[in-house]
Amino acid sequence: MKVLVTGSAGVLGASLAASLSASGHEVHGVDVRAAAVPEAAHHVADVRDTATLRGLAAGMDAVIHTASALPSYPADQIRSVVVDGTRSVLDAAHRAGVPRVVHISSTAVYGLPRLVPTPEDYPQVPVDTYSAAKVDAEVVAREYRAKGMCLSVIRPKTFLGPGRMGLFAMLFEWAREGRNFPVLGRGDVRIQMLALEDLVEVIGTVLRAEPDIANDTYNVGAAEFATLREDFQTVLDAAGHGKRVVSLPIGPALAMLRGLERAKLSPVYGRLLSKLKADSYVSIDKAAARLGFAPKFSNRDAILSTYRWWTEQPPATGSGTSSREPWRQGALSLVKALF
């Protein structure tokens, strides 16, 4: 199979391109950054460059759209990359007659759902620029489904694996330095995550699935997950300094973090702050029943494997806004002296 992977220099895109190449597929990657997978052909381009995407999509058997923006991006860039980029990719695939497309969305489309586990048909109520953009990108996807495209929509929870940094690099850094790590309130909320390897596997599954199975929308997340306190504690235990997850009074801590966010002095964005106050997990029953999805890894497995990978990397010399880079801690780099 000849497959085009957008966002192929990202954490998911690179892992997916490597996996597909190892399975014998001819993989072409496209990203604004340099190649991350030597086994795959690489094209430096922006997914919003419609003319270039049309050329790349020609002759493909499948397109997997992983390119996206993150909540840490400026608002106008989030919408442009997520919505306009998705339309550009799907337009190119449609014009080229690509028989199979996989669109990687997010469980952020549910906003802050009151029902857990959250099913795929739960109302989409975006609460910020990022979640609104993800909702609108799915609207675009449905437009192309209506035109006859076989299009899988995958909604993963936050995924972890080798290559992933972002906000998790802060937890890892504090753990390695022998610090306690704070959580809001008791930290007894259950936050479902997902192992990168499980996500790559389910994407491969929808590529091979019959059209009536593939042409659908699926939540994917870990089947086993504990409380945030317990999952974060596994990292502190692995660091071996005897440190603990410590509770912060939820009211004052939220007020401080929201103030720091408004002043652009903290990478902890608003929707994440709200998520940390309540359980957040989705139903994976549909993916299990129709795709045979059976996650191999728990939250604990995913976060520990990512931490172990991180400890083997040379110290970061800077920060950025992608999931491959540690995010700038801002004022929190000073606060950590208290822990």
Regions found by a protein language model. Give the residues of each.
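Substrate-positioning beta->alpha
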Residues: 136, 164-170, 185-207, 215-216, ...
